[in-house]
């Protein structure tokens, strides 16, 4: 089983990453609590449930302290479960702008009644174990949604990236094409 743990700051692009991973064949589970990580991975490997490629999204909604994260990762290590970590990040000013543009509130801001800036600082501290152990870190500061998705596909698609598709549309205004034009001769 290929196990990928996806984490990162709220608003940095985890949902885009998870959607891209699902598009390239990963079985994706969002918002996994730290306490359930070892159980979910064991279930994913067991008998008829054996899944080939699993991506688990973990963030501050299910991981309330850095100690919980450390303990969950330690349990995976003790069980001999191999995994990789993808950490999605962006600078605080970019995340603040994204929250402002979408008019959404940060999950910690809602739960604890603190400012978005304070919530981001707390979130960075909580998620630090993921960041420190990350095999891949993507800074989405200068990436569009499409570029973020493309980067994920290039990293994790079995063939090394999504195949390019090209569509050609021809408009014939005044005449039909001759058979020679269609055959390419």
Regions found by a protein language model. Give the residues of each.
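Conserved glycine(s) of the Walker
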Residues: 13
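A glycine- and Lys/Arg-enriched "phosphate-lid" helix/loop adjacent to the NTP-binding pocket
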Residues: 83-128, 136, 140-141
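Phosphate-binding beta-loop-alpha motif at adenosine-nucleotide cofactor sites
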Residues: 134-145, 172-173
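Single conserved hydrophobic/aromatic residue that forms the stacking wall/gate
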Residues: 174-185
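Hydrophobic anchor at the beta1->P-loop junction of P-loop NTPases
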Residues: 6
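Conserved nucleotide-sensing/catalytic segment adjacent to the nucleotide-binding pocket
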Residues: 30, 40-73
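Post-Walker A helix-loop "phosphate-sensing" segment adjacent to the P-loop in P-loop NTPases
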Residues: 23-30
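P-loop (Walker A) phosphate-binding loop of NTP-binding proteins
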Residues: 9
